[in-house]
């Protein structure tokens, strides 16, 4: 979810009539805060225990594109020895979210890669609304799951690029259980300046040269940033009454409150001090599974009430 007015920073909570879900969106405005950021717990339920992250691929994704995102999801958990992720790692970054559970009765969820669902026939068409995203999310597990809908670069989704790069929400309670869901779109052809910064020049603000993406794909590396933000939002505010700042209709969550911040010294138009791969020249801040490198957003550390970057 770019520079001062195009990098992502607020959240939006909307209620769909049919599904009654709470949706938080990674929007397109940047926010670099110097003041303390307090995430208030609103006493709602949190995810707990073992949670499968199921990936629903809508439209055409190449095998290498799917591998980048699949490996990112696998990176969220700390692998057993002898193959730990080099530090700074995606797993260590994700552990910052665990601090939100310190005073909760819930046990911090253990995320694991679940099933893959492929829809390369565009069964719902190439223009999707909120209800369509929910229908797609329902193709994953009905309970103890985060069902992630990933739309290809030729799929138009209501609000995509204009106000958001991704959303998260939850299904209503049912006998089958309840699942959380995430949607993220590939911005490669529609809005890389909004939803793939700093790997593409922003639409607005300072026009610094874009950074080189670590996986060689501007759109998919941008999707990883949005997916990371939305998964943390799902873990800390799954049902709209968890941890957030501000009004429930437009909450700021652990990642979206730090939009546009990826390294120390970040300011609007500058992502911050990042690691650079000497072989490829790619910029990143976290190591992942299978030797992958990723860019993940800063998170609000509840112990310091400030945006915390990796490393």
From Swiss-Prot:
Disulphide linkage map: none
Protein name: Protein PHOSPHATE-INDUCED 1 homolog
Functional note: Involved in the control of organ size. Upon auxin signaling, is targeted by the transcription activator SMOS1 to regulate cell expansion during organ size control. May promote cell expansion by modulating microtubule organization.
One Pfam family recorded for the sequence: Phi_1
Superkingdom per UniProt: Eukaryota
InterPro entries cross-referenced by the UniProt entry: EXORDIUM-like
UniProt record similarity statement: Belongs to the EXORDIUM family.
Intracellular or extracellular location(s): Secreted; Secreted, Extracellular space; Secreted, Extracellular space, Apoplast
Keywords: Apoplast, Glycoprotein, Secreted, Signal
Expression sites by tissue: Expressed in leaf sheaths and nodes.
Miscellaneous comment as given in the Swiss-Prot or TrEMBL entry: Plants silencing PHI-1 exhibit partial dwarfism due to decreased cell size, increased cell number, and abnormal cell arrangement and microtubule orientation.
Gene Ontology CC annotations of this record: apoplast
Glycan-bearing residues: 60
